[in-house]
Amino acid sequence: VFGGSPADNTTPFFFNGAMDTLKPFLDDGRLTIGSGQDDFDTVSTLRWDQATAQKRMEDLITSTYSGGSKPLDGVLSPYDGISRGIITALDNAGYGSTIEEGLPVVSGQDAEIASVKMIADGVQYGTIFKDTRKLASQAVEDASAYAEGEEPEANDTETYDNGVKVVQSFLLE
């Protein structure tokens, strides 16, 4: 399990959502985290850095997976750059160059071009595409409302508490 940068306020939302989804499977033993590393502080990846993720995966392969000789089915990654670091470490350890050749399933997010190509080549399992056109459209609507002295639209008035106040947000689907 890998997490995003601890300095990014969205990182805990992804991590907690993923762990909440995986919890029943971890609890009943259908899934295991070989390293036992499942807390946010341990799995987070400072600055979403690919090289940092690759180094952590190399260390996990050495310490938990006998240098690549123990099976590993998959790795949860919250960002395509982190995913590419993980995949490089797995490939270098001999797990295979593609999923078909034994490379563990690695998730991702942001649909970066390099990762989309890796998906097409059978290397990365998947990614999440967030349509920035929708984000830009909503941002323009909100900025226009604010410029006209109106309240920008918010569809979440409870989730994002920054410790000082709850920040109203518009969550895209």
Language-model features: locations:
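A residue-level marker of the well-folded mature domains of exported/periplasmic proteins
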Residues: 1-173
